[in-house]
Amino acid sequence: MQITRESKYIIGLVLALGVSFATLLAHLFTKPSLEWVYNHHATPFFANKFMLGGYLLVEYLSFLLMIVPLLMLGDQVNDFTFSIIHTSIWYNVFVVFTVWAFTREKLYWTAFFSLCLFSSSFTMYGQSLRLRNGFVEMISMKLPSKLVFGKSLWFVVYAFSAALHCTGIGCRVFSNVFIWFFAAMYLVPILGFHDWALSLVSAYLFLSIGIGQMFIHLFALQHIFAFIIAGLMTLFAALLFLLPYRQRRAALTGESAPLLQDNNAGPAV
């Protein structure tokens, strides 16, 4: 019996997700635990762990949704879908190495693997943009790609700040400035591709940073800036979500204007 291409990708994805999730879960109970190491290495971009936990749970559930097009479409699955799933498998492999390095407090290796995670997530996000905006594609491919890309960009910044471990006054001032450049990194794809969903994802992440900084009280003003950025990202998401409807309404108004003028015009004398 020959195993189909779809079956191979389903098996590979389920195995990668299982190993990745089991690694995360197991290191919650090791010594030192994942939670202890994360709390011990608070940085200016330390995010609330409970909000991150909820984010990770949604992310793993969204990964499982990648199986949907393979089961529903069969031979009609395009190459971009297979490519996204293939990249997501590698992403979960890098998660295992990242957790291993982080729980052993090998922070420079953690920073290196964070770049591997970001590279994989960036590839996933770029490939997902080539898919059509159908409901199945949105929940099964685009949503996981946006969640992974948003979190990976945050984790790169957190991992490098943890590796450098600079807590002096100069670093604190730099962090208060850099958080705005960090927000601008999200705005490039958000505004470039009119991605309201990614804007919501980034708003959630900045909100978690704000709450995390508010509780640890290590870096002055950082939580205030994070809350402001979260509000701005939410506003951008709302505007980008409504933009197609406004454009469609403007187009319909423009098309109906000549007809109204013709109807209002009197007969030629």
Swiss-Prot record:
Bilayer topology annotation: Multi-pass membrane protein
Domain of life the protein comes from: Eukaryota
GO cellular component term of the entry, any: membrane
First-listed, main subcellular location of the protein, grouped into a coarse class: membrane
InterPro entries attached to this UniProt entry: DUF1774_fun (IPR013920)
Keywords noted in UniProt: Membrane, Transmembrane, Transmembrane helix
Segments passing through the bilayer: 9-29, 50-70, 82-102, 107-127, 147-167, 173-193, 200-220, 224-244
Pfam short name (any one): DUF1774
Subcellular location: Membrane
PANTHER family for this protein: DUF1774-DOMAIN-CONTAINING PROTEIN (PTHR37992:SF1), EXPRESSED PROTEIN (PTHR37992)
The protein, known as: Uncharacterized protein C637.03
